[in-house]
């Protein structure tokens, strides 16, 4: 079963899965593995806590083998994908220090439907703007995945809306460890 529903809706569907059903979810419903963190960032109570343990944060380039053993496959968000894919290998190999600065820019389609209502009186189509500061929803998802590798990673993440419909660019500022060459990274 594939779902691309508003946050909270796939949780309801997951409560009715049959034994052989697999749910592939594009919402944030199962991205966060902690019900309290989910509520903090998404402002709604998780309605399928029992299924969190049956789900996996499925970034296939990183955890391909583990995906096949789960009933609920949660697809990462766009910003987290653009940030985690380049950083996880560097963190796993301990090539970089733990302070990471990410400056991300996205087309306005990535901010969801509500963005058009929120900015209807602004010139969304001709200017750039920061949003979701200081606590963008994807911070929780990114930090969760970092914590699986190393604790105490300091992430400074600033998302921007750009005057284009779709696309994403994340510029990531890292400091390599002293004994590491640029080629190693």
Could you describe each region identified by the protein language model?
Residues 110-184:
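Charged docking surfaces used in two-component/phosphorelay signaling
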């Amino acid at each position: 079963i594939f779902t691309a529903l508003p946050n909270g809706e796939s949780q309801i569907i997951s409560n009715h899965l049959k034994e052989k059903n697999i749910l592939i979810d594009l919402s944030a419903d199962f991205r966060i593995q902690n019900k309290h963190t989910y509520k903090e960032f998404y402002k709604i109570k998780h309605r399928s806590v029992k299924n969190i343990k049956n789900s996996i944060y499925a970034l296939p380039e990183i955890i391909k083998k583990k995906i096949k053993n789960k009933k609920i496959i949660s697809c990462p968000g766009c910003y987290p994908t653009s940030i985690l894919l380049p950083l996880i290998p560097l963190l796993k190999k301990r090539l970089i220090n733990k302070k990471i600065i990410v400056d991300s820019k996205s087309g306005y389609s990535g901010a969801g439907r509500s963005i058009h209502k929120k900015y209807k009186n602004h010139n969304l189509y001709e200017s750039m703007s920061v949003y979701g500061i200081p606590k963008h929803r994807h911070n929780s998802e990114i930090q969760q995945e970092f914590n699986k590798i190393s604790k105490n990673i300091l992430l400074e993440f600033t998302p921007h809306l750009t005057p284009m419909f779709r696309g994403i660019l994340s510029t990531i500022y890292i400091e390599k460890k002293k004994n590491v060459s640029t080629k190693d990274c």
